[in-house]
Amino acid sequence: MAKAKFERTKPHVNIGTIGHIDHGKTTLTAAITKVLHDAYPDINEASAFDQIDKAPEERQRGITISIAHVEYQTEARHYAHVDCPGHADYIKNMITGAAQMDGAILVVAATDGPMPQTKEHVLLARQVGVPYIVVALNKADMVDDEEILELVELEVRELLSEYEFPGDDVPVVKVSALKALEGDKEWGNSVLELMKAVDEAIPEPERDVDKPFLMPIEDVFTITGRGTVVTGRIERGVLKVNETVDIIGIKTEKTTTTVTGIEMFRKLLDEGQAGENVGLLLRGIKREDVERGQVIIKPGSVTPHTEFEAQAYILSKDEGGRHTPFFNNYRPQFYFRTTDVTGVVTLPEGTEMVMPGDNTEMKVELIQPVAMEEGLKFAIREGGRTVGAGQVTKINK
């Protein structure tokens, strides 16, 4: 069966849900698809909770893509929405997921107010450069006292300001995702109001379409009879079918190949552009030739490196960071784009140790090469938990 072509008539914006576990991120995601389907049935499909909760790709391909993607449209825009799992051990996906957002819907239960993971997700949103946040004050149907709602809203605004988001100006919309999902008209309207706020408060992103093509690989799988497909979000540039690309990073040698097909939401494209989540079919490439963490680039536009200088912020104990300082030759993982690479840290002259909560300069030597340029951001992690964040300031080798 031929695939429908993807229509690119409306502005395309990537958003997602973030926030504490059980505050209703996935329920809200499902409610948005239902309410928009009811309002504009010709341009929206409804996605059921369990379909999103289990990430449908997982079941279809027998491989784990651990972030659920749904798409929907308002009158003004086409949205691709990622639902990030809430647990701390999914923070890796929070990092890859949040990196895919032009803006985020921060879900806070009115019954609880901001909780530790709310804080952690806002901090991560700040670190990975999520530029705009809209707040959904969920479960508002369960709070009778207007004053409590106001207090919770104030707390959320203060939290956002603390992490350098414009807390006073961020839209806060009271919703009940569950009631909206159950078909309650009034609470359904609250979800439409939320999406109106998203339309207005999350600007259309400036796309990097004019820069040379680059896409970090998130996943690799084989489609029987067609070959190897890699998926990811195009970070910048434009890629047309039948163009030549290099695959670099992680391995010592680069691989050169031709892209024979580009897909988005199971529809075929002639080209993929910055900001879009796509699958690329690669000619003559085996499943084991490529891996998550590598990047696909316009040939020669970026080079892999192992030694760099960086400015980093080390999380305080209260932010979920280390409880003790680290010293020279500290060996954490550096999380670049979609993968962890171990590196050895050299501290500046005269710095004996770095305390949780400090900013520091550092030199890093990685055990595997990473495609990098100045300004590239990374997280510093230990055993799966984020303990710092930084940016490459200079490449040495």
Curated annotation (Swiss-Prot):
Per the UniProt entry, what are the Gene Ontology biological process annotations, in alphabetical order? Answer: translational elongation
Q: Could you list this entry's UniProt keywords, alphabetically sorted.
A: Cytoplasm, Elongation factor, GTP-binding, Hydrolase, Magnesium, Metal-binding, Nucleotide-binding, Protein biosynthesis
GO cellular component entries = cytoplasm
Compartments where found? Cytoplasm
Q: Where does Mg(2+) bind?
A: 26
| G2: annotated segments | 62-66
Q: Where is this region: G4?
A: 138-141
The record, for SUPFAM superfamilies, names:
EF-Tu/eEF-1alpha/eIF2-gamma C-terminal domain, P-loop containing nucleoside triphosphate hydrolases, Translation proteins
Q: What does this protein do?
A: GTP hydrolase that promotes the GTP-dependent binding of aminoacyl-tRNA to the A-site of ribosomes during protein biosynthesis.
**Which PANTHER family does this chain map to?**
ELONGATION FACTOR TU, MITOCHONDRIAL (PTHR43721:SF22), ELONGATION FACTOR TU-RELATED (PTHR43721)
Designated name of the protein: Elongation factor Tu-1
* Gene for this chain: tuf1
